[in-house]
A protein has these predicted regions:
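Glycine-rich phosphate/ribose-binding loops and adjacent secondary-structure elements
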Residues: 118-207
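N-terminal capping/small domains of soluble enzymes
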Residues: 1-118, 126
């Protein structure tokens, strides 16, 4: 359904305000592409302004709501992020206002750390089960994306496809984040173009 092969990646409500999330939705809709919720859940402003909205399921589960899964146009399971492969994140307490805290069911004004691993599965076999669970929740109506940080793209692409993903999202190290240490941002991971070739090789072999 998308008009261009470029989408807006997930940026959390909390890191961005409601107006910014709405603006991203309007911009994506004007260009015929999708935007993504990010950590912290879905806002009504974002859903209302976005023609195509991808709901991210992250290890933290902050703001996770099954009803919002059904309102989304696709679901993206975040296994990793290119700017911090293998690492979690943190949202500073100064950004945790009453609404953000309420959506995340955490205290207002306190730094909030995000885990790097999902609490309810540990490997590719469990990922397949999680994909089936999400399909059941959404009545098999939503495509399932798997987002991986570009660290070992050949193997991760293979595992995601075999687990039943409809789309593999390959996130390179240049994606950027304000929620991790500089050593991750500057020195860990692979640029998107370099990782893309390995991912394509994996897809060709699977065919």
């Amino acid at each position: 359904k998308l008009d261009i092969p470029i989408t807006i990646a997930g940026m959390s409500f909390g890191a961005l305000g409601a107006n910014a999330k709405e603006a991203l939705g309007r911009g994506a809709s004007a260009m015929g592409t999708s935007t993504t919720t990010g950590d912290g859940g879905m806002t009504k402003e974002e859903r209302g302004s976005s023609k195509y909205l991808v709901y991210q399921l992250l290890p933290s589960r902050y703001g996770m709501n099954p009803d919002d899964l059904r309102k989304a146009d696709a679901i993206e399971i975040v296994v990793g992020q290119g700017a911090k492969p293998g690492g979690g994140g943190m949202l500073l307490g100064q950004k945790i206002n009453k609404r953000v805290a309420g959506m995340r069911t955490l205290p207002e004004g306190i730094d909030q750390r995000s885990a790097c691993r999902h609490p309810d599965w540990t490997g590719p076999d469990d990922l397949e089960i999680k994909i089936q669970e999400l399909r059941e929740i959404t009545n098999w109506e939503k495509p399932i994306y798997i987002k991986v940080g570009a660290a070992r793209p050949y193997y991760d692409t293979t595992l995601a496809v075999k687990a039943g993903a409809d789309v593999v999202v390959l996130d390179g190290m240049q994606g950027g984040t304000a929620a991790t240490q500089d050593v991750f941002i500057e020195h860990v991971g692979i640029p998107t173009l370099g990782a893309l070739r390995e991912s394509v090789d994996a897809l060709k072999e699977l065919n």
